[in-house]
Amino acid sequence: MKKRLVTLLAGLLTVLSMGFGLAQFSDVPAGHWAKEAVEALAAKGIILGFPDGTFRGNENLTRYQAALLIYRLLQQIEEELKTQGTSPTMEALAPEDLEALKNAVQELAAELASLGVRVSALEDSAATKEDIARLEAMIAELKAQPMPEPGMDQAALKDLMDRVEAASIAADTALAQAQQLAERLDALAQDVEGVKGDLAGLRSQVEANADAIQALNELAVLLNQDVLSLQDRVTALEKMVSGGQELPDLEQFATKEDVAAVQEFAAALRSDLVGLSDKVSKLEEQVAELNKVRYSISGSLSATYGTVVTDTGTNFDIDRLFPGNAFSTGTYGSFSSSVQAGDSNQGNISGGSASLTFGVKVAQPGTSGVNVSEASATLQVPAAFGTAYTSAPTIRLNAASVKGNVDGQAFSVVYSRAVSSFKFNDYLFANDNDSEPANPRQGMVATFSATKFPLAPEVTVVAGVAGPDATKDTAPALNGNYFGIRTAVKPFSALNLALNYATNLGNRSAIGVDGGLELGPAKLSGLWVSSQTPGSPFADFFDNTLSDWAYYAQAEAKLGPLSLSANYHAVDPQYADGQAGMSENEDTTYYGGEKAGAPYGADTRGLGVSASVGFGPVTLKGYAESEGDYNLAPGSVNDAWGVAATLGSFRGFSLTGFYNAAYTGGNGYFSLTTAVDAIAPGVTYYYTIENQKYSSSWGVRVAHDGKAEDALIPTLNLTAQYATYYVSGHTDIQVYADLAKPFKLAILSLSPGFRYHSFAGAGSAPTYTTLKGGVQVSTDPLLFGLSLDGAVSYRRTQYTNNPSNVTTYELYYRAGVKLQDFLAPKLNFSVAYAHYEGDQLAGTGLPVVGSGNQAFNFARDRVYRSPDPIAAPWLATPGTQAGKLDGFYIEAKYYDLTVAYGEFVLDDLNGTNPNFGRGFKISYTVKF
């Protein structure tokens, strides 16, 4: 059949080559015996050659190429059949020959597929290197012998081939076992990592076994390479057999004894692998036993030496010059920005501390009785050394915790020496956000999930003692012993309820309930807290004239594109400063409300509704609120309502129009008594609030979002707004822009920004115009890791009325050089110079500290000091503060080692009142 196929193909190709122009290939030499056939097939489109114009006739034909040639040939035949005309091809081939040709092609495709399977099987097989070497030697010896007479023993050859294949399969099985063991060893290594201290001896065994497995894997790779070579030889033998040629007797090439030796070697290899597997299994059992309980030790050591002083004792801020410098005192208390606190006169800042944490963790704790899953304890030496010698530094238990279960029900107990953290609800025992702390609390917090009890309550118990901090809060929310218990239940999935009791011995006691309910698209939530002083009967908790109440009810609903919300609330004035609720989060003495999380302020009673709905690109919003003091005293009620419509987003642009109305002096809800420009500027209303809520205003705003996917100008944020405060007749225009991410220009990264603000005040209000611009720039690392960075920000506010012809300005700039991996990897060095100055700023004297950091916030006027419209634009009046601050700063860091030095001077604009400051600091922290 194969001979007939070859004959038919040759004839067909010859016929196809008739009557067509000849194609030329650059590498088919003239006079070559196949040149005519090659050119004829190329002209017919069956052979196309390579893109470089060559035929590459000496390269092997792949199965893919063969399939492509046959496919093109069949296409040619089918096209000629469809024409139902005459052609050289059709005339030269008889119908029976054509049918035979198709059948032969299909048979050839099947044989090619079968050959692919056999080749893949041979590629996946493996044999030992020694056996292959022996077979190769025998083949070489056989080739050297003269060819015997025809008549080889076909049965012997088949037997030899069967034994070789069996040996390959055995070796392949051994290789698979070795690979499986290698994977098991990798997983084992991860477990061993967690118990390094207890498995030092076992690790050496595992590493030795891993080396052995690696060696076996490498051997298997070499064997596979040898098998590929042997495969080529076997294929050649198969071709000789299929071609009808007789081969020499291969008994003398490889006897049955030789093959048996190969099988014995494979069996020995398999036995060794089984033994190794047993060892690994034993190691895994030992690791599992050790992993039942894991122990850990961690801690840190830190030391600082240095001093920061000024020659005059003036404690001025240096964060304005160098953000994130090593001398910064950061933010604390009511300071929301580090520029509001002085840094330059800290004095001796030397000291050291140490901490050590011991931990234990049970991998699979029991579920019957009391079971501990993990526990930890932290010892601390807060003043390992300080500014004065002490022979016995204080060592204290700083924190401890235990987690586990009781009959499968989770529990936890946490102890803290000074910052015990817990919160029952917004108005009771809210003490989880004052980490400095201003109100030190030493105590425990225990939780228990009683899932096997009726209603599966979640119980929280807190107990401890608290006290004041003489330097921070002398009237804290908790003072003395305290205790509280909270029980939360969930009768069904949509309802949750919690009952609370809390007491601060000798000061306050309180009870409360809070919860929530979900009804389809609606959500309801609320709370009630009643607090009273000691000595009052329990019944007084339920009389709001004899106890202090805080309560609210909130409702939310979402109906398709429509969202609705409503609230009613009342908070007794005794909840101010967190007193009635025993909540340091609400402290105003030290934190100034910065930590507050309660939704409604003390001494308030009111209600409000809001709604929003979207129709395609249009969104409508509205609100209405009315609130007075807790007793709704006459004249205390403030009302506000407003609407806004936004069209967007198109290519990042949106258009918003808004209208608001604000009233004060009411005697009841929504009495709309006296229209005002804004309600409580700086408290209720502030300049950057959304759509100028709580003011009497209308306006329009166009904005472009540089982060939008379809932004017209990617990364560009642009806002332009016009607003009128119609009660007094003020008008306000602001336009500002910045980039959502730095702009890359060659080696430069640029973050520019711009602001224009014009306010025209009516009556006695000021009229002024502010221009502000700035840019932050840095370069990519240049030669030897050197890079440059800098920044500049400038604002100028010109007052033309009330007061007239007054100009206030601020200027800040910084330039620096950084060296990364300087002299050694991870050694970074930087040096910078910075300058800040201003005139006619809010306040008097020198600009010792800032009002806030707005240097590169272009939605605000100020750089570091007011005047600024944040409370209300008509309140932004200039002052008489003027001065400048200069300095240079050097810092080197190597991992957690920091060395810093800086010199600074605060002076008036004329340079006649200098205050010099100097700082030096070396600090290092080791964590283990």
From Swiss-Prot:
Leader peptide range in chain numbering: 1-23
GO MF term set: porin activity
Gene Ontology BP terms: monoatomic ion transport
Pfam family, one: SlpA_C
Localization (cell): Cell outer membrane
InterPro entries with a match to the protein in the record: Cell_Envelope_Struct_Comp, SLH_dom, SlpA_C
UniProtKB keywords: Cell outer membrane, Ion transport, Membrane, Porin, Signal, Transmembrane, Transmembrane beta strand, Transport
Gene Ontology cellular component annotations, sorted alphabetically: cell outer membrane; pore complex
Domain SLH as annotated: residue spans: 24-84
Bilayer topology annotation: Multi-pass membrane protein
Domain of life: Bacteria
Entries under PANTHER family matching the protein: OUTER MEMBRANE PROTEIN ALPHA (PTHR43308:SF1), OUTER MEMBRANE PROTEIN ALPHA-RELATED (PTHR43308)
Comment block on domains: Exhibits a tripartite organization, with its C-terminal part forming a homotrimeric 28-stranded OM beta-barrel (OMBB), its central part forming a long trimeric coiled coil that can traverse the large periplasmic space, and the extreme N-terminal part forming an SLH domain trimer that can interact with the PG layer.
Function: Plays an important role in the structural organization and integrity of the cell envelope, bridging the outer membrane to the peptidoglyan layer. Appears to be a nonselective channel.
Subunit organization: Homotrimer.
Protein name: Outer membrane protein SlpA
Record organism: Thermus thermophilus (strain ATCC 27634 / DSM 579 / HB8)
